[in-house]
UniProtKB/Swiss-Prot annotation:
Keywords: Cytoplasm, Heme biosynthesis, Metal-binding, Oxidoreductase, Porphyrin biosynthesis. A divalent metal cation binds at residues 98, 108, 147, 177. It comes from Yersinia pseudotuberculosis serotype O:1b (strain IP 31758). SUPFAM superfamilies: Coproporphyrinogen III oxidase. It is an enzyme of class 1 (oxidoreductase). Involved in the heme biosynthesis. Catalyzes the aerobic oxidative decarboxylation of propionate groups of rings A and B of coproporphyrinogen-III to yield the vinyl groups in protoporphyrinogen-IX. One of its GO terms (molecular function) is protein homodimerization activity. Homodimer. This is Oxygen-dependent coproporphyrinogen-III oxidase. It is found in: Cytoplasm. Its EC number is 1.3.3.3. The gene is hemF.
Length: 309
């Protein structure tokens, strides 16, 4: 099977949104997701869910969208001029979780499908997605676990998949104007359309399903750790990097805004509170300095555990 089954993809994505929201609400134990279904005037719509002011999660947004249009925006055709003049559909689930506890990392995941069609010509389609982790106070055990899950889900699809998509993630989530990684990475892939539709779809499902396996054990380990104003202020400062990346560099944000997407859903990735501080430098040998020294530089986390891959 090499012709895309959009109904199959949509069913999976809606189920994935349900599963992730259910797991997050259960872990929070205090707040529930509110849902808003929306329609896009130019075509399509979506289902946005957000949890706010929880006991564990200050804000968690999990968005499903299925949008369509008669013509692609500049952000899409700039890199792929062959798509000009084609109608398109884009389906995806995207989520960003901003915990309250500074010892809990922010996490992001996204799985998506894109197809551009023109009468009389073959459709152009691909999958993309991934997940990445942004700690404020890093724990080696958590970083290894995160990457071990990523490695394991890639293995059935080939030995080369994890290192390739890990590097892509490290390269993509890099804040160029800060010369600094956004976090400790994970997986990132795009333009996936070979060897065939079902293989690509199966891999995309593995990534989507892998998110909870990667993130929820970290939530369970860290959500009860005590914290104070110092940790909170550092968390708010580091959230600024998240905002900078999403508004300046993230292709998905730019695509959404340029296609007339729903602004509230697109900017749901931004943290509810954030601060900037001129020329901040962490104290030498502090827990804050350890983030810059031990976690933000790119490294092979599986090698620490002595794994081969």
């Amino acid at each position: 099977m090499n012709s895309p089954d959009i109904a199959l993809i949509k069913t999976y994505l809606l189920t994935l949104q349900d599963n992730i929201c259910g797991a997050l609400a259960q872990a929070d134990g205090h707040a529930e997701f509110t849902e808003e279904c929306w329609v896009r005037e130019e075509g399509g719509g979506g289902r946005s869910r957000v949890l706010v002011n929880g006991a564990v999660f200050e804000q968690a947004g999990v968005n499903f969208s299925h949008v369509s249009g008669a013509m692609l925006p500049a952000s899409a055709t700039a890199h792929r001029p062959e798509l000009a003049g084609r109608s398109f559909q884009a389906l995806g689930v995207s989520l960003v979780i901003h915990p309250l506890n500074p010892y809990l990392p922010t996490s992001h995941a996204n799985v998506r499908f894109f197809i551009a069609e023109k009468p009389g010509e073959d459709a152009v389609w691909w999958f993309g997605g991934g997940f990445d982790l942004t700690p404020y106070y890093g724990f080696e055990e958590d970083a290894i676990h995160w990457h071990q899950v990523a490695h394991s889900l890639c293995q059935p699809f080939g030995e080369q998949i994890y290192p390739r998509y890990k590097k892509w993630c490290d390269d993509y989530f890099y804040i160029k104007h800060r010369q600094e990684a956004r976090g400790i990475g994970g997986l990132f892939f795009d333009d996936l359309n070979s060897p065939d539709f079902m293989t690509c779809f199966n891999f995309t499902q593995a990534v989507g399903d892998g998110f909870l396996a990667a993130y929820m054990p970290i939530v369970a380990r860290r959500k009860a750790l005590g914290w104070g104003d110092r940790e909170r202020q550092f968390q708010l400062y580091r959230r600024g990097r998240y905002v900078e990346f999403n508004l300046v560099w993230d292709r998905g944000t730019l695509f959404g805004l340029q296609t007339g997407g729903r602004t509230e859903s697109i900017l749901m990735s931004l943290p509810p509170l954030v601060r900037w501080e001129y020329n901040y430098q962490p104290e030498a040998d502090s827990a804050e300095a350890a983030l810059y020294r031990d976690f933000l530089p790119v490294k092979d986390w599986l090698a620490i555990k002595g794994e081969t891959h």
